[in-house]
Amino acid sequence: MAKEKFDRSLPHCNVGTIGHVDHGKTTLTAALTRVCSEVFGSARVDFDKIDSAPEEKARGITINTAHVEYNSATRHYAHVDCPGHADYVKNMITGAAQMDGAILVCSAADGPMPQTREHILLSRQVGVPYIVVFLNKADLVDDAELLELVEMEVRDLLSTYDFPGDDTPIIIGSARMALEGKDDNEMGTTAVKKLVETLDSYIPQPERAVDKPFLMPIEDVFSISGRGTVVTGRVERGIVKVQDPLEIVGLRDTTVTTCTGVEMFRKLLDEGRAGENCGVLLRGTKRDDVERGQVLVKPGTVKPHTQFEAEIYVLSKEEGGRHTPFFKGYRPQFYFRTTDVTGSCELPEGVEMVMPGDNVKVSVTLIKPIAMEDGLRFAIREGGRTVGAGVVAKIIA
C-alpha cells in the first residue's frame, strides 16, 4: 500500500512529558491522545502502546522515548514521553532536547521529588524554553491547602533553575480519570482539555530555523532491504529535500551522500524541515558507515572538532553532582546532541581545582571529533550521571 502524504495544514509544535518516575507521565500522554481524538479527531494511542519497550513491562517504568502525535484546534503536536527513571538520564537528555515546551508532571500526592528537580535542571541545560505544569493525581488529595503547598513548591523549584515559576501555568487534575473518560470536579477530561489549550496559548509558535543550512543529529540508523540506509533524528535547522547532497560529520572521517527519501510518522514527504522528527534515506551509504552521534548536514557548513574552550557549570552535591572537586586532567564524558565522547580538561592558569557548584572556563580535548560550532551546549557526565553542563565558547582545533 502506498504511504499517505503527511498533513501539513496545522502548524507543528514539539512537546513532551518530564517528571519523577511513577508520577503519571505516560498516563497523561495516553490521556492527551484520548481527549484530542474525541475533541479534535486525531488518533488515540493506548497506554500499553506508549509503554511498550520490552524492559518497561517488567519494571513498569518507561525506558525508551515514545513518540505520539495529536491535534489541538490550532496545532499539530508531536509528543515525546521522556523516560523518568534516573538510570535513563541519557535518553532524557536526547528526549528533552526535542521540545519547544515541556509538560512537567508532578504528583499532587507526593510533591516534587529528586527527578522532578533533575528534569527541570536538564530542561534548563538542554534549552527547553517553556514548561507547563500538570499537577497529577489531584483526585487523591482531599486537602486544598496541601495542593496549594505542592503548587508553591513546584513554582519555587522552577524559579531556582531560571524558569518563570510565578508565571508558569499549573493545571490541576487526574490523568487516570481523563484516560478513563471521567470528569469528577472537572479533574479528568476538562483538566486535560485545559492543558491542551494552555499548550496552545503559553508555548509560542516556535520560530523554526528553516532558513539556516540543514543539520540533523543522527539518533538511530536502520537498514531497509531494497531501499538502503535510513537515519532518524530531529532536524535541528534548515530543510532537506529529496536529491539534496549531504555530508555525515563527526566521530570518523566526513563522508558524502545523497538524500533519496524523507518520511515522518511512516508517511512520505518531499522534504524534512527544522523541528520535525523524520527519517532520511541515504543513497550509497551502508548501515555500518554511519552511527548515532554523527550529524547529517548541508555540505561544507559544519566541521568536526576535538579541541575547544567552554564555559561549564559543575553541579553541586545537592543538585546530584559530584561530592568532591576535580583537578586538571579530569576525564569525564561530554554529551553532545546524541552521544557521549570522553575528553580531558585543562584548567585556567592559577586555578588548581574546581569545586561542585563552581562555574569555570576550561579547555577540552576530545578523543573523537564532534560536529561543533560556538554556542553548542553539552552535558558533562560520569558513568551515566550528569555532573555538569556547558557551552562551547570558542573552537581551537
From Swiss-Prot:
It is an enzyme of class 3 (hydrolase). Residues 174-176 are annotated as: G5. Residues 136-139 are annotated as: G4. Keywords: Cytoplasm, Elongation factor, GTP-binding, Hydrolase, Magnesium, Metal-binding, Nucleotide-binding, Protein biosynthesis. Disulfide bonds: none annotated. It comes from the Bacteria. HAMAP family: EF_Tu_B. This is Elongation factor Tu. It comes from Pseudomonas syringae pv. tomato (strain ATCC BAA-871 / DC3000).
